[in-house]
Amino acid sequence: MLSLLALAVAGPAAAQVWPVQREAEALAVDAAEVARTEGGTAEAALAELRAQGASVALTEWIEGAYRDRLAGLSLDTGGDVSVLLTGRKPVADMMAQAGEATVVVRFRTGAKATRDQLLAAIREHQAAIRAMLARPPAMGIDARRGELVIMIGGADAAGDREQLRKRIERLTDVPVRLAPADRPDGLLAGTAALDAPPSPLVGPVVPGGSQVMGPDPVNGRRYICTTGFAVSDGERTAIVTAAHCPDTLEHIATDGSRIPLPFVGQWGWGFQDVQVNLSPLADRAVFFADTARTQVRQVEHQRGRAATRVGDLVCHRGERSGYSCARVLMTDFAPSGDLCGGACLPMWVAVAGPSCRGGDSGGPIFIGTTAIGLLKGSSYRGDRSCGFYYYMPIDYLPEGWRLLTVPRP
């Protein structure tokens, strides 16, 4: 649910100036946040983040080489790769070079269904599974166990869970596990920087990771969301946020000044939740990552869903929750309810918090200076703390619009 924010009027203000982070500095900041959240040292976290980016080509090769048997692929803490295969024929572990890191690839066998079979089970039986339960559930694929995860709560969780699990398993003919709706427990078991530092960013500008506000046409209340990244259709520049945010939006700068953002369109069916609002001031490929919005990062790269692995570290900035980093839980996730103009497709990515709040919708998902996605929604525990959030991968931007990145040197 979006969060209500009181309307405030601000007068004119002087131009604002923000220092710009490049890739090396941005990764160091993210590594410090990972170390704070998970424990360990910032040095170890930084080494893992570098290996994470460098190992994408390796895991893409593994997925292609073992596609007929692949049940799941995930990253372990430290950056090693775990591969789960169907069948009993063993595959020897291997070591591979990923940038400066040596990555261990461990193979396990004995899974009962491939990833393709698990995805087909969601596509073919999602409606029937929803009909079995009091509330349409979220569902996704546990890449570590090779199981279809159905996330239930309330009356559904209070019933005969084992009988329900068996019913769904008979229907889908794949392994099924039921998990609490507020936490899918068990799922957690580039180019060189320029020699010269980037010039500071001088406002006014409409960056990603900042606040937008607009009225609900039905109840008249004003709601806040978070901007994602700057985009272009080749002629115009714009900023993206979530499609479920208000159509009519104003950008609220850190000094309180406001910039109208004319509405272009929204895409919110099945696998997308993205809205485009125009602004000539969204012509810089920059976004806020820090909670206080004191400095910006340039967008230097992008990484799509196919290159995202369970266990990857990603970060996000939300207008209400601020900045945090955590690990990917599922890359084949279908949110609960009818949040996608009906049932959602299993094409979203779920991340283990640790912070999310109403008003974060549309905010940037990133690591370092790499754009990864836009936050769609969150699941909360009974005490309203953040259980997990989920996002739309950046490669699902609407047709005709592309992500702005800094020019190559």
What are these regions (language model features)?
Residues 2-3, 13:
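Cleavable N-terminal signal peptides
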Residues 15, 38-48, 116-141, 147-238, ...:
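Protease-domain processing segments flanking chymotrypsin-fold serine proteases, especially trypsin-like
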Residues 16-84, 196-219, 409:
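Extracytoplasmic low-complexity, Pro/Thr/Ser/Ala/Gly-rich segments
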Residues 19-26, 32, 36, 46, ...:
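Short glycine/threonine-rich beta-strand-turn micro-motifs
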Residues 68, 77-80, 100, 134, ...:
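Extracytoplasmic
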Residues 77, 85-89, 109, 143-145, ...:
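A mature extracytoplasmic/lumenal domain signature
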Residues 187-409:
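Terminal interaction modules at protein C-ends
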